[in-house]
Amino acid sequence: MMEILRGSPALSAFRINKLLARFQAARLPVHTIYAEYVHFADLNAPLNDDEHAQLERLLKYGPALASHAPQGKLLLVTPRPGTISPWSSKATDIAHNCGLQQVNRLERGVAYYIEAGTLTNEQWQQVTAELHDRMMETVFFALDDAEQLFAHHQPTPVTSVDLLGQGRQALIDANLRLGLALAEDEIDYLQDAFTKLGRNPNDIELYMFAQANSEHCRHKIFNADWVIDGEQQPKSLFKMIKNTFETTPDHVLSAYKDNAAVMEGSEVGRYFADHETGRYDFHQEPAHILMKVETHNHPTAISPWPGAATGSGGEIRDEGATGRGAKPKAGLVGFSVSNLRIPGFEQPWEEDFGKPERIVTALDIMTEGPLGGAAFNNEFGRPALNGYFRTYEEKVNSHNGEELRGYHKPIMLAGGIGNIRADHVQKGEINVGAKLVVLGGPAMNIGLGGGAASSMASGQSDADLDFASVQRDNPEMERRCQEVIDRCWQLGDANPILFIHDVGAGGLSNAMPELVSDGGRGGKFELRDILSDEPGMSPLEIWCNESQERYVLAVAADQLPLFDELCKRERAPYAVIGEATEELHLSLHDRHFDNQPIDLPLDVLLGKTPKMTRDVQTLKAKGDALAREGITIADAVKRVLHLPTVAEKTFLVTIGDRSVTGMVARDQMVGPWQVPVANCAVTTASLDSYYGEAMAIGERAPVALLDFAASARLAVGEALTNIAATQIGDIKRIKLSANWMAAAGHPGEDAGLYEAVKAVGEELCPALGLTIPVGKDSMSMKTRWQEGNEECEMTSPLSLVISAFARVEDVRHTITPQLSTEDNALLLIDLGKGNNALGATALAQVYRQLGDKPADVRDVAQLKGFYDAIQALVAQRKLLAYHDRSDGGLLVTLAEMAFAGHCGIDADIATLGDDRLAALFSEELGAVIQVRAADREAVEAVLAQHGLADCVHYVGQAVSGDRFVITANGQTVFSESRTTLRVWWAETTWQMQRLRDNPECADQEHQAKSNDADPGLNVKLSFDINEDVAAPFIATGARPKVAVLREQGVNSHVEMAAAFHRAGFDAIDVHMSDLLAGRTGLEGFHALVACGGFSYGDVLGAGEGWAKSILFNDRVRDEFATFFHRPQTLALGVCNGCQMMSNLRELIPGSELWPRFVRNTSDRFEARFSLVEVTQSPSLLLQGMVGSQMPIAVSHGEGRVEVRDAAHLAALESKGLVALRYVDNFGKVTETYPANPNGSPNGITAVTTESGRVTIMMPHPERVFRTVSNSWHPENWGEDGPWMRIFRNARKQLG
């Protein structure tokens, strides 16, 4: 039976206004819109009155429910029938954890009530199209129609393909019907294999073969034989990549054989809790570094949010499934799309060339895709610290004559680093009889055929197959699985995981054969043991769907009880679905129909399928020289600063958590003005050291339209000039991931791909001492469609994205682009050797040209010398600022450095040649360094020692003030105020934020950027940062116990434990499942801290589901009430823990006036480094800190204080319960965005109880307790940042 319960309003006023504006623009006479959530409960038994009240209370969250009866025509948007939304999975978990076992499932829809003039059926279809994502959702016209969400269908049996009766044609028909993308020779192979077996294949076997042998999974082109211009080539593409490892194997521990590559890290204290006691401690051991970069292009073109989210999620799983289990740590993301054409902000180079109906626009991708990628990383708890963004779409005269080149099929790049124990780097042995396990969520009828779909050019497959290949994301489930993997690797030798892979393209049909085959075994499986929420799925759908957040593992049979215990504690679902066999055979039994849908020798599936040969021709580019007529430097500057590739990326940065883990030493945002211009991302290797890891990206795809090899060389060069900004040492410590995107089969592109791979794999990287131990290829970068009777094609440029990773010697020595105005000199190191080529530059693009000659690596020895010289100068602390020259050229390099330093530039380019335009906009490799005037001679000597004397040019100095002036020989070449340039550079991000977020907030942020008087972040402390008030108490040897409390989805507990540990506590890991099961109580603890993250993925309100699982369980409720009433206890709630504890007011004495915390005014997750002041309050944790003003990490989507009315706010203030407030850079309490990131009244961001024993706050002190993890800090701070005082106060209070 289904019950319907009304929910809170679903859309903020500005979202409704945006919808109305869209309807008006489409000339649809819609007058009013009201939207509210509607909940549907599928019950297996009736609820009594108490249970019903409990369910109603559970589903009461967010803004107050509307009292009026809605008016207008109902359009009910729900998840597609036959799918289960992430919201449903998590809300149902909460209901069960609150004791409501009668609830089979909860689901949620949005009911839109629309009042409109007379609309035709076609116009109503336009309205519904605006309200839902057809890939994920459906529209009903009555609430009762939602019954379809819970419809159950009978299982369907496997289908046989009549090969023996109908011959080869049966396979050809199945290939088209199922969208298998099989080549002719593969059809021949299958015909031969099944004829020899003497039976017909089942659809599931063909599907499994297609996925396992798709280009996506098998990389056929990279393993192919090559004939170019009639000449047989000696090596495959992959062999040329492997050549880099053969030449420079140094420091690589694993390459080409696992889900990620591994290189040597540093010996540090890894911090985690003991399995038996729950006590956190440091474990001194090597923390080796793993690296992986994936792409998820096809799904992102179809449905950008889930496409980008599952792209990030899949890459995170690759990291976790490395070796015998590893820990993902920090991420990067990238996008290449066609022109944005932002409404009202269209640029002169942006022409509309049309697109296929089935894919979304570049603007849609960049509105939704980055949010999906960021949301997954945020909820999983991985900081996103690096990225790139390129737009390109133009009709150009390239290798193949005049044609359309651009990114209608986008690049969505997701990558990152992690850490792994030395003894877990290599996979283990799979014993015969080992249990084969699926860890993670249930099978669902989604994401079918993603591997094969990704391997086709967009436009070749049926639209319904595109629809089927989109996946959905549930990062909170992946977090639970990762917690299990963490518990396993933390056991060291007792790790129960023998072998692990992630489930990606092809689902279990690819993952399980790969698992057993890699382990040298076969496998027998039971289909019906696979967890599934949809009983009506066919065997093919159960085995081959790409439901996310799953891993496959081999676990020794005698270790299964331990594994079961770990999974139950973390509430991570798992199923034992088979066991490993001696015989290399794959069998899948179906208990329901008592038949064998799969019964195959493994070598039929993964054996010697036909090898591809590429027989291709070379084409030379025909580019025309850059036409200069009408180009002025002033106009060029404004255009280039508006090009999204160059323009400010804040709209892509602040949506992503950049502080979680407490180990982020360098994020994108630089300096007191938080400008997103960092050269590279840097993390600390642990919470107790200055060793670290660095990541950087290099990419110059448009250059490939003129010169394939130069484009590839520049990508490597740019990655190197970016990562050089931190202290790495020997260049052999740097390892690269190469992600290759090409339109295979397009005239000239295959030969160009070979040329590019050869340039990097055979020549440049071996000469530099660089290794490429990991990478990925995507070979179908083309879209086709029809405009009227005309056939259209958009082909991407050959695109190589290089991600560089390295161990860091000392993270404190990372150099940023932030200029200083002390007596200084700016030096350009020009690795272009004066060539100043303008082909395929940002300048050429904004004037709709390509040019003829591009930049290139002009001298490999000088590039190596450059890296070594910069490393020497970094180690000697001789550099004040550093920024590489890249998109936009020297002009942009200097401008970004000035923005970061909030200063002026007095530049002189006389020594850079007579062509001023080329000197300023050429994108040859190089960098600008700032040095003290007194050090200039010594610095130039170091550069000369490394063979760079002829590359060094003095180009002026940074000056205080607002002027940005470039001269040559006494003549002004360009002059403008830095503030004006800053505003131009910011306009793209402003327009994107206005479209996507609350436009009022976007306007406030943009306005703030034009304030030259802004002093930036600054610090005023009322206490001595170096005083350790806990020291006398630590000296006693007593270590009070603090319960570090987490719920499923919490992700900030480790850094929280480390902060308390440093202050003299024994930090104990306490999961809510421990309390609910009675394994642990709170009676033995002196302090309790509820940590940040996304408990239950923030469904049912941020922290509210967590709180209700306490309030609705009598024993646990009493446990918390007793703790809060016990004198001499302390409690802290941070972020999600703050939201949770604000909902426990009925249990916490003196908290009656606490507010609720609701959706930010911006309607967006906000990750900021914000200034707060400590106010006078009873809070025991903030004693001695009153009056201090200091920055702190902020990361939340629901942090806005909501009070009942003005009287409630006045009472909260008059009782003195406000503990922290947001202030602007002038020290004034603020409600203005983004200084106040959530819009809380009076800047309130922390409150306390009347006794001061319980304090809750939205910002994260535990992420910045070390100075090194602050995005910016005064230079005189030592190891501990000022927020360490909170934790020491806690220790002092407990005596």
UniProtKB/Swiss-Prot annotation:
Active site per UniProt: 1135 (nucleophile), 1260, 1262
Keywords noted in UniProt: ATP-binding, Cytoplasm, Glutamine amidotransferase, Ligase, Magnesium, Metal-binding, Nucleotide-binding, Purine biosynthesis
GO MF terms held by the record: ATP binding; metal ion binding; phosphoribosylformylglycinamidine synthase activity
Any one Gene Ontology BP term: 'de novo' IMP biosynthetic process
Entry EC number(s): 6.3.5.3
Residues given in the record as ATP binding sites: 307-318, 678, 886
Domain Glutamine amidotransferase type-1 per the UniProt entry, residue ranges: 1042-1295
Main location: cytoplasm
Keyword Lyase: no
Region (Disordered): 305-327
Pathway: Purine metabolism; IMP biosynthesis via de novo pathway; 5-amino-1-(5-phospho-D-ribosyl)imidazole from N(2)-formyl-N(1)-(5-phospho-D-ribosyl)glycinamide: step 1/2
Subcellular location: Cytoplasm
GO CC, one annotated term: cytoplasm
InterPro entries in UniProt: Class_I_gatase-like, FGAR-AT_N, FGAR-AT_PurM_N-like, PurL_large, PurL_linker, PurM-like_C_dom, PurM-like_C_sf, PurM-like_N_sf
Residue positions binding Mg(2+): 718, 722, 884
Reaction(s) catalysed (UniProt annotation): N(2)-formyl-N(1)-(5-phospho-beta-D-ribosyl)glycinamide + L-glutamine + ATP + H2O = 2-formamido-N(1)-(5-O-phospho-beta-D-ribosyl)acetamidine + L-glutamate + ADP + phosphate + H(+)
PANTHER family membership: PHOSPHORIBOSYLFORMYLGLYCINAMIDINE SYNTHASE (PTHR10099:SF1)
Subunit architecture: Monomer.
Job description of the protein: Phosphoribosylformylglycinamidine synthase involved in the purines biosynthetic pathway. Catalyzes the ATP-dependent conversion of formylglycinamide ribonucleotide (FGAR) and glutamine to yield formylglycinamidine ribonucleotide (FGAM) and glutamate.
Family indicated by similarity: In the N-terminal section; belongs to the FGAMS family.
Protein name: Phosphoribosylformylglycinamidine synthase
Gene (UniProt): purL
